[in-house]
Amino acid sequence: MYKKLSNIDFRYFIGQRVIEINKEKNEPFGMALETGGLIIECPWRLRIANQIEIGYSDCIHSPGEFSHKNVEKVLLDKRIKNIFLFEEVSDLFVEFENGIYLELFHDSNYFEGWQLRGDDGFYLFSLPGGSYSY
C-alpha cells in the first residue's frame, strides 16, 4: 500500500520537548510541548524501535494495567525528531529521540481524530472521513 507524505513543513516542532502528558481519566489523550500541543482522539500506538510499547486498545481493554501514565514514562522530556503526515487518511506519525514513534490512526467518518497546534499559529487537525485541515 502506497502512502503519500504531505509537504507540510513541521520544522517548528522539531527539537521540541514533551513537557506534560494528560493522565486524566475520561479525558482525551494529549501532550503539551514546549510551544505547542497534540490532542489525540483516535487509535494510536507507541512504538520503540520495532516493539509496540503500549497502544489505544491496551488502555481501553486493560485500564488497570495500562494508562496514559505508561506513555508518560516513555515520552516525558523526549524531543521530537520528525513528523510525518500521510495524506490518504490523515495518519500522523511523530518520531522522537531514541527510536520512539507515536503513531496516530484516524478511523472515523464522523469525528475528528487529532489536533496538532503550535504557539506560532500552526494548527493542523484530521477531519471526519480522513481528510485534514491546515
Provide a role label for each language-model segment.
Residues 1-134:
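Surface-exposed, interaction-prone regions used to assemble/regulate multi-protein complexes
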